[in-house]
Amino acid sequence: MVGLSHYLILGSLLFAISVIGIFLNRKNVIILLMAIELMLLAVNLNFIAFSHYLNDVAGQVFVFFILTVAAAESAIGLAILVVLFRNLRTINVDDLDSLKG
């Protein structure tokens, strides 16, 4: 049977993979957004595991709200990224440091 510790180990591995992805690839904005979303999903997995272990539905409902906010965040982030790519022709983080006024 799959216990709580298995879910927590999986969540911590996903979180560690996303942190490593952020530190190893600081150039591409799309990969940074994907790593941040993976980090959020790892935390949600831990919420679900604890909620199931404690027989409490409130944690699972909270995860649905978090996923809704994460979807909106991803949509806004990708929309901003599309506008930046249209204006600057790059998605490199180093090239996005200048401001136009």
Curated annotation (Swiss-Prot):
Family under the similarity heading: Belongs to the complex I subunit 4L family.
Record InterPro entries: NADH_UbQ_OxRdtase_chain4L/K (IPR001133), NUOK/Mnh_C1-like (IPR039428)
NCBIfam families: PRK05715.1-2 (NF004320), PRK05715.1-3 (NF004321), PRK05715.1-5 (NF004323)
Quaternary data: NDH-1 is composed of 14 different subunits. Subunits NuoA, H, J, K, L, M, N constitute the membrane sector of the complex.
Protein's name according to its UniProt entry: NADH-quinone oxidoreductase subunit K
Function: NDH-1 shuttles electrons from NADH, via FMN and iron-sulfur (Fe-S) centers, to quinones in the respiratory chain. The immediate electron acceptor for the enzyme in this species is believed to be ubiquinone. Couples the redox reaction to proton translocation (for every two electrons transferred, four hydrogen ions are translocated across the cytoplasmic membrane), and thus conserves the redox energy in a proton gradient.
Subcellular localization(s) per the UniProt record: Cell inner membrane
Top-level taxonomic group: Bacteria
